Amino acid sequence: MAFLLHQARFYTTVNHLRDLPPTVQPEIAFAGRSNAGKSTAINVLCNQKRLAFASKTPGRTQHINYFSVGPAAEPVANLVDLPGYGYAEVPGAAKAHWEMLLSSYLATRSQLCGLILMMDSRRPLTDLDRRMIEWFVPTGKPIHTLLTKCDKLTRQESINALRNTQKGLDAYREQGVKGKLTVQLFSALKRTGLDEAHELIESWVRPSVADEKSEPVAQ
């Protein structure tokens, strides 16, 4: 999948549900608070510097951006960059539009096979992060959390952040949530967790390939 993600290109941008592309390829959505490092993480995962753009004004971008991955003639999946959330100075009308767009997309998009949720490792699981989770968990599809900027933490702080976030996610399972809720440390700067994230996305997009890799080789 690393090589597959490295074949990523801009596909389209969407501001209304009616404009979502009529594609059939599986989609992986990326969500996170403004300044959680979402655009940087996407660029590192795709081995590009300027694929996903971060607005200089947090909360300014309110569009859904699509990036196709795989061969240009026959893309095998789409990465979907959702608008960042949580910036206090965004006008009320923009917040309402963001809430409608994201909640409807996450709840109803049949092509969506999983959600990558970006959280700053220094302050994970805010109320808005929980809202994103609660919009998506009814689908039964997996959510994988990247605790970004973990290079800014000490080893013990990283352990605590990982443990506390997993505990928060486990609470949803105790409520009967069926989809997988997993978490890992990630640093775009140090490339920490890059291989793990690649492998997980591969298992979502091409589960048959991932299953073959996990099967023991016959002797």
Swiss-Prot record:
Cofactor: Mg(2+)
The keyword Cell cycle is assigned to this record: yes
Record keyword Nucleotide-binding present: yes
Domain EngB-type G, residue spans: 24-207
Biological process annotations from GO: division septum assembly
MF terms in GO: GTP binding; metal ion binding
Residues the entry annotates as binding GTP: 32-39, 59-63, 81-84, 148-151, 186-188
Keyword annotations: Cell cycle, Cell division, GTP-binding, Magnesium, Metal-binding, Nucleotide-binding, Septation
Its biological purpose: Necessary for normal cell division and for the maintenance of normal septation.
Protein name stated in the entry: Probable GTP-binding protein EngB
Organism of provenance: Burkholderia ambifaria (strain MC40-6)
